[in-house]
A protein has these predicted regions:
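Mature catalytic core of soluble alpha/beta enzymes
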Residues: 1-306
Length: 306
């Protein structure tokens, strides 16, 4: 998780300092054990073990278990087995997305896939030993790790004050009614560029996450690619979308569903979000902003034309 975490505690109580310290420690533990960018991390040690058992700390064990739950909940649209695809596109290590245009040559090792096929994922868990068996393909927890860290930090901070906000790399959990008593006001960044948001959300006891290709896009062998991998093709999702924002009662599932809806793309996102009752806002490649039915209650303001 290449993100910093920020906490806001409105009207803190006597427990606040201790709870903030605890929440910071939780975030750091998740970031340390669940990163794919450190070969010595618990996640990468589990990836190296493959079909063999690997003992991991509790936060990594719980994150992999949560990833399996999300994989099942989304019927395979969320799939952490994206590491080989990202590595084959040159994203095996951190890249300076925010400071320069990136052009790379593809690496060997990416696997092709028949379009439309969802592959079952069946990792193993040994609770007594805190051990996991991820399987024959390495996994990346980037699609759920921030959301889980925000969830666990928010749970630690919940009783630290009247209202709490936890934010990590755009994943947000808003607890309570906020400083003004009418909800936390959260802006949704435009994926088309510029500093003006496409919407402002009013949230109370809700999480929000956005999946966007505004930053993590680069060129490989002359082709524009991005980091959101479609598990049906093992290639960057061809979705005709720029970003998807989801409001949910849980930050991990806000993150999971924002990516899953991005993957199904412009042609299917409205049906899936409405069928699942998901509060979603999406911006397509032409800059059009669209809301699902369930999102309307959270929108305090939205742009009329991007």
């Amino acid at each position: 998780m290449a993100s910093q975490v920020r906490f806001w505690v409105h009207h803190p109580n006597a427990q606040a300092v201790h709870r903030v310290d605890r929440a910071q420690s939780i975030f750091e533990a998740v970031a340390h054990s669940c990163t794919r960018f450190d070969p010595s991390s618990a996640l990468m040690q589990a990836n190296a073990a493959g079909k063999n058992w690997a003992s991991v700390p509790a936060e990594c064990f719980d994150a992999i278990a949560a990833a399996l739950e999300a994989h099942q909940e989304t019927s395979g649209l969320f799939d952490p087995r994206t590491l080989e695809a990202l590595t084959s596109l040159g994203y095996g290590s951190t890249l300076p997305f925010e400071t320069q245009q990136i052009s790379l040559t593809s690496a060997a090792g990416g696997r092709g896939q028949k379009v439309g096929r969802i592959r079952p994922w069946k990792p193993g868990f040994d609770v007594a030993r805190s051990a996991v068996r991820v399987g024959d393909e390495p996994i990346d927890l980037g699609g759920i790790g921030k959301g889980l860290a925000v969830r666990w930090c928010a749970n630690e901070l919940r009783d630290a004050g009247e209202s709490i906000l936890v934010e990590a790399g755009g994943d947000v959990m808003a607890i309570g009614v906020g400083p003004n008593g009418d909800g936390w006001m959260i802006s949704v960044e435009s994926p088309m560029g510029g500093s003006d948001p496409v919407a402002v959300l009013r949230l109370t006891d809700r999480a929000v996450a956005t999946s966007s290709i505004r930053i993590r896009s680069w060129v490989v062998d002359g082709e524009q690619v991005h980091h959101i991998i479609d598990p049906r093709t093992r290639r960057p999702a061809q979705s005709f979308l720029r970003s998807v924002t989801v409001v949910h009662d849980d930050p991990a599932y806000a993150e999971v569903w924002s990516k899953s809806l991005f993957i199904v793309g412009r042609s299917e996102i409205r049906k899936l979000s409405d069928d699942k009752g998901l509060a979603a806002l999406w911006v397509d490649v032409e800059g059009r902003v669209t809301l699902s039915r369930a999102m309307r209650e959270y929108v305090a303001w939205r742009v009329s034309d991007v």
